From Swiss-Prot:
InterPro entries cross-referenced by the UniProt entry: ARM-type_fold (IPR016024), Sda1 (IPR027312), SDA1_C (IPR048292), SDA1_MD (IPR007949), SDA1_N (IPR012977)
Biological function: Required for 60S pre-ribosomal subunits export to the cytoplasm.
Family designation: Belongs to the SDA1 family.
Ranges of Acidic residues composition bias in the record: 484-498
Main location: nucleus
Region Disordered, residue ranges: 484-524, 605-688
Bias-annotated ranges (Basic and acidic residues): 514-524, 668-681
Keyword list, A-Z: Coiled coil, Nucleus, Phosphoprotein, Protein transport, Ribosome biogenesis, Transport
Gene name tied to this protein: SDAD1
Protein name: Protein SDA1 homolog
Annotated coiled-coil segments of the chain: 254-318
Highest taxon, organism lineage: Eukaryota
Mitochondrion keyword on record: no
Amino acid sequence: MSSRNNNKLPSNLPQLQNLIKRDPPAYVEEFLQQYNHYKSNVEIFKLQPNKPSKELAELVMFMAQISHCYPEHLSNFPQELKDLLSYNHTVLDPDLRMTFCKALILLRNKNLINPSSLLELFFELLRCHDKLLRKTLYTHIVTDIKNINAKHKNNKVNIVLQNFMYTMLRDSNATAAKISLDVMIELYRRNIWNDAKTVNVITTACFSKVTKILVAALTFFLGKDEEEKQDSDSESEDEGPTARDLLVQYATGKKSSKNKKKLEKAMKVLTKHKKKKKPEVFNFSAIHLIHDPQDFAEKLLKQLESSKERFEVKMMLMNLISRLVGIHELFLFNFYPFVQRFLQPHQREVTKILLFAAQASHHLVPPEIIQSLLMTVANNFVTDKNSGEVMTVGINAIKEITARCPLAMTEELLQDLAQYKTHKDKNVMMSARTLIQLFRTLNPQMLQKKFRGKPTEASIEARVQEYGELDAKDYIPGAEILEVENEEENAEGDEDGWESASLSDEADSDGEWVDVHHSSDEEQKEISEKLNSMPLEERKAKAAAVSTSRVLSQEDFQKIRMAQMRKELDAAPGKAQKRKYIEIDSDEERRGELLSLRDIERLHKKPKSDKETRLATAMAGKTDRKEFVRKKTKMNPFSSSTNKEKKKQKNFMMMRYSHNVRSKNKRSFREKQLALRDALLKKRKRMK
């Protein structure tokens, strides 16, 4: 009887929904009956909107599921649903409100609602005190905007939504403003809204009174996102084999050295592939998209000076200001005295503050402003009353600041710091040596003669630029090396360059070996001698002639770069060579736009750990130590036991006639006889 009742269509909405989707015209009457029933429930709901209604929730989901089957009847259904939500969302029952939102999401997925109006409604619903609803709406907003811009950038919709989000960031409800900011950051991270307008809208959140919003915006610009969430949404993780697959494949296959090498090679390829797919720090490029970084930095500094936030938030503000000043080369002279207040060895997180001071230094800052900063660091850190680590950090900070603003260093201060080259502490000594090495390339004349080292070609050509001076060249420095290397080829070449090139191509295409020119030590020495014999002005003239007369290839630029690097090692004309010519790796590490904390905290000698630290490390190792038994760990803990394990636990009578037992090497008769004799002798001794 119950099964017959379940088959009645008016009371069984899932079955009716299934039949309508198969054949809509055949069930128009049943649909109209349910539609009228829905209307009457809506009228009842309007009288008491705060009352839960399970029947209305079922009817709303039913109408949303079949809305595409009867568009003429349900043309006003999406708008009615939006009106019900917008007028009553504060008093609605949470379950009914969630049902209405899910129905609207379903209608949006069927493209029956305009995205702009729906997303604006959902942003208003973020004010509701319903965490699950906010999470659902956040996911839908991000996914929907991603789908809107899937094929091409839909600027019309994007502009409307960005303007609306700009107003939402200034909303009085902190939760709604925070989620709006999270949406914009997530869309920027996914390269959907990666334009300047999005970035400049996010900059307004840096002046929010709400700490959570302020920290989220600062974190975005500083590139310190929270721990990467390894959700199932990440598409790149599902592609290709994982390390576990490779290990299982090796474990189940034949154990040989060849297969082991294959596994190692495959693991290397997998690691390389993962590194290639790993996205870069997504928000560092956002600093470059700010419209008016000078005004933005000034406002941030004003906020920092009057801020009453926690110390960590102040540190984030200082970090962002220093990055803005360093990257955009801004004039923010009040920032340096503000930082100087915190430059004390006992100051909390002082190494980071030194890093911010170095980041904010650049060649356009007047030297006298940076000089006071350098003197503060030198007086507070580089003194004999401090420990070796403190002095090392101070010298490292001075080195990084002067690398960006060389004119700030005075000759007197440099000579004082150079004296630490013979300090008893190895860390201080090595830091002083790196500072001396820096000024050997920047301005050797500031160093005492004994610290200048052997003069090289680069140090002879080095010239200190005055403040604000631009060194604009009309030639490529080092291009004269090409003329020397290609001099014989140019003399022997045909008048028609195109013809000679085609002839050489035909000769090379015969499949024979092609002579490749390798620069040996003798050839490099000969080239450098020829160049050294030329005056500096003649070198510049030849470099200008080469730069204007030919198009340089990538190989030519590589040769020029290597020649410029050789100048750092080759002795100056008339001086003895300090060491033999050594090969230079062309892929040397370049200095980036930002400093790392390691540049400030670099210690060449690891400090000794005290007794308490060593004891704590030893005790920590003992607590995690298991029994002294080697246990084979299974890759799958729920897998069945092996035949070898089962054999150990079997009854002997079951194993008695097995091949392993019968073919087992047993003792001979003589061995048994000797064993019996020894046993009897031993027993007789015990009896005595």
